[in-house]
């Protein structure tokens, strides 16, 4: 069959399948599966580009990491005025009820504050205090927020909180953690901790020793080096890996580290924290301690100038994400954050033993999504997350900077942006209405941005103050925008359907409907997800199914 005829045949096949879907979703699934992979490759082929695929205006300036929602929390100035949303009432834009506009007042009431909304700092610290288990959530003991669920969440986040340096919030350089020394002669643990490097450790002292001994490993080519490094990265725990060239545009303009001070805990121990937890729990209000700020000087803090960035992705559990916004969905996010640090540390040690400098990073040091796009791992979606072909947005990103020159991968396009233009499901599912409903992304201007956004790049607007306000109200991270995403599937044929639908005019309006016809995602409306019992049923399924659903 000629290529044109084959293309037409497949288009007709998909159109017929779509029409039949209304009558019989299960039958269509059987019809479509054998066809969609070929159809997607012909109608919507995956392409590579040598240039960064999104517009970056000449006015673009590097992002200050201390402006992001969670790092801004620890700026005392953010505790002086009420938290501000970019749009006070998004119902004027969406035509739907604004389910997020009252969150600042509700969060203030949760803190015992009357007569005003919560500040930015109060909002975020309310979230952190509940998330760390120091304060019960308002849903405590409901299905998905029980002591069992919360214990799983604590275990999942433990490495990130205790050994990574709490770098999930951003910052840099590297990480520091408080540890309690032990007397090896008496086995007594000290009451006072000391600050030491965490897993995101930039100590490259071993590299010079390897080089001085003439033991630096020499690769035959950049291509061979990339192949070996990718293989090692997968073995050490990554699910996906790509190589990006070092691009200074994505390095934060300011690095920062939260200032920790000693806080006396009820058990008599001193705990170092970036906010005064005992004062808050006793009703004395919220107090934070600010930042230590650093110029982004690679040679000073890491001993080298990066040439390449190893960017890797860790999958989050499909069944756990389906329970969003429950604590179970937070647990798989926490597991990935904990694993990010472990895997990044192991990659860094591997490189150092070969005689190359390395700086392992999580959300700190630089913006992960554009680096992952450059590394060919996916596209940037409406929800601001990286959409991969295999996991959709259901993953976390980490990276390791190195002076080893590697052959970079190329950005790939497989239909995500075209699909996001049509779908808007994540925007509809957001309890805070933080995600733009505009059809097309655009190069954002300063007036389009809330304080945590960086203007002059092409994307959809996101309001992190709205998002963070719901996290505080919920007492746990929310992953609704991930859970309902049509790319969040363990069967990749659905992704092929999405790619095809964006390219055929008659199917475009139905693009987001395919997975709904096939029974995926549950309710999109955030209130209905809870009120219908869907989230509660997904939590029960999670605990009752001993084997995880894997890709």
UniProtKB/Swiss-Prot annotation:
Zinc-finger recorded as keyword: no
Domain 4Fe-4S ferredoxin-type intervals: 411-440, 478-496
Note on how the cofactor is bound: Binds 2 [4Fe-4S] clusters.
Cross-referenced PROSITE patterns: 4FE4S_FER_1, 4FE4S_FER_2, TAT
Induction info: Expression is highly induced in the presence of PCE and TCE. Located in the pceABCT gene cluster that is flanked by insertion sequences including transposase genes. PceA, pceB and pceC are cotranscribed. PCE-depleted cells grown for several subcultivation steps on fumarate as an alternative electron acceptor lost the tetrachloroethene-reductive dehalogenase (PceA) activity by the transposition of the pce gene cluster. Exogenous vitamin B12 hampers the transposition of the pce gene cluster.
GO cellular component: cytoplasm; extracellular region; plasma membrane
GO MF annotation terms: 4 iron, 4 sulfur cluster binding; metal ion binding; oxidoreductase activity
Enzyme nomenclature, EC number: 1.21.99.5
PTM note: Predicted to be exported by the Tat system. The position of the signal peptide cleavage has been experimentally proven.
Keyword flag 4Fe-4S: yes
Catalysis performed (reactions): trichloroethene + chloride + A + H(+) = tetrachloroethene + AH2; trichloroethene + AH2 = (Z)-1,2-dichloroethene + chloride + A + H(+)
Main subcellular location of this protein, as a coarse class: cytoplasm
Keyword annotations: 4Fe-4S, Cell membrane, Cytoplasm, Iron, Iron-sulfur, Membrane, Metal-binding, Oxidoreductase, Repeat, Secreted, Signal
Pfam families: Fer4_16, TAT_signal
Subcellular location: Cytoplasm; Cell membrane; Secreted
InterPro entries: 4Fe4S_Fe-S-bd, 4Fe4S_Fe_S_CS, RDH, TAT_signal, TAT_signal_bac_arc
Group of enzyme by EC: oxidoreductase
Deletion phenotype: Chloroform inhibits the growth of the wild-type strain, but not the growth of the PCE-nondechlorinating small deletion (SD) and large deletion (LD) variants, where the former fails to transcribe the pceABC genes caused by a deletion of the promoter and the latter lost the entire pceABCT gene cluster.
Cofactor(s) needed: [4Fe-4S] cluster; corrinoid
Signal peptide residue numbers: 1-39
Function, in words: Catalyzes the reductive dechlorination of tetrachloroethene (PCE) to trichloroethene (TCE) and of trichloroethene to cis-1,2-dichloroethene (DCE). Can also use various chlorinated ethanes such as tetrachloroethane, pentachloroethane and hexachloroethane. Reduced methyl viologen can act as the artificial electron donor.
Family: Belongs to the PceA family.
Annotated protein name in UniProt: Tetrachloroethene reductive dehalogenase
């Amino acid at each position: 069959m000629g290529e044109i005829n084959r293309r037409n045949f497949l288009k007709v096949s998909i159109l017929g399948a779509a029409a039949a879907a209304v009558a019989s979703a299960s039958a269509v699934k059987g019809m479509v599966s054998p066809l969609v992979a070929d159809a997607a490759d012909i109608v919507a082929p995956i392409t590579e580009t040598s240039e960064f695929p999104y517009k970056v205006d000449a006015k673009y300036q590097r992002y200050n990491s201390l402006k992001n929602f969670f790092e801004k929390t620890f700026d005392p100035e953010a505790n002086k005025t009420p938290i501000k949303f970019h749009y006070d009432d998004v119902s004027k834009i969406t035509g739907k009820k604004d389910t997020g506009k009252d969150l600042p007042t509700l969060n203030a009431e949760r803190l015992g504050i009357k007569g005003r909304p919560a500040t930015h700092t109060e909002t975020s610290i309310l979230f952190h205090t509940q998330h760390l288990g120091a304060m019960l959530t308002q849903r405590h003991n409901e299905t998905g927020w029980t002591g069992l669920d919360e214990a799983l969440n604590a275990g999942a986040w433990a490495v990130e909180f205790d050994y990574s340096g709490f770098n999930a919030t951003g910052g840099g350089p590297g990480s520091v953690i408080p540890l309690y020394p032990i007397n090896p002669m008496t086995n007594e643990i000290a009451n006072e901790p000391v600050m030491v490097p965490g897993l995101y450790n930039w100590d490259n002292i071993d590299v010079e020793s390897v080089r001085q001994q003439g033991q630096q490993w020499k690769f035959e080519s950049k291509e061979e080096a990339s192949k070996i490094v990718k293989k090692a990265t997968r073995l050490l725990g990554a699910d996906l890996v790509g190589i990006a060239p070092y691009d200074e545009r994505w390095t934060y303009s300011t690095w920062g580290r939260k200032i920790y001070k000693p806080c006396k805990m009820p058990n008599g121990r001193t705990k170092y924290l970036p906010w005064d937890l005992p004062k808050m729990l006793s009703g004395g209000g919220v107090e934070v301690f600010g930042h230590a700020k650093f110029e982004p000087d690679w040679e000073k803090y890491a001993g080298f100038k990066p040439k390449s960035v190893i960017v890797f992705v860790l999958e989050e559990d499909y069944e756990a994400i389906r329970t969003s916004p429950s604590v179970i969905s937070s647990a798989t996010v926490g597991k990935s954050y904990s694993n990010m640090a472990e895997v990044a540390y192991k990659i860094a040690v591997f490189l150092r033993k070969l005689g190359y400098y390395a700086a392992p990073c999580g959300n700190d040091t630089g913006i992960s999504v554009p680096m992952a796009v450059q590394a060919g791992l996916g596209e940037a979606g409406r929800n601001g997350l990286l959409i991969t072909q295999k996991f959709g947005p259901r993953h976390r990103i980490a990276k390791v900077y190195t002076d080893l020159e590697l052959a970079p991968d190329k950005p790939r396009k497989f239909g995500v942006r075209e699909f996001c233009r049509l779908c808007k499901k994540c925007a509809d599912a957001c309890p805070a209405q933080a995600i733009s409903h505009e059809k097309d992304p655009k190069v954002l201007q300063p007036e389009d941005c809330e304080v945590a956004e960086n203007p002059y790049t092409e994307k959809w607007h996101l309001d992190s103050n709205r998002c963070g306000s719901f996290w505080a109200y919920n007492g746990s991270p929310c992953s609704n925008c991930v859970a309902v995403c049509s790319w969040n599937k363990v069967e990749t044929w659905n992704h092929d359907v999405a790619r095809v639908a964006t390219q055929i005019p008659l199917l475009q309006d139905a693009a987001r409907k395919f997975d709904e016809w096939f029974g995926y995602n549950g309710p999109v409306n955030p209130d209905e997800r809870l009120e219908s019992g869907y989230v509660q049923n997904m939590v029960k399924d999670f605990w009752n199914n001993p084997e995880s659903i894997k890709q």
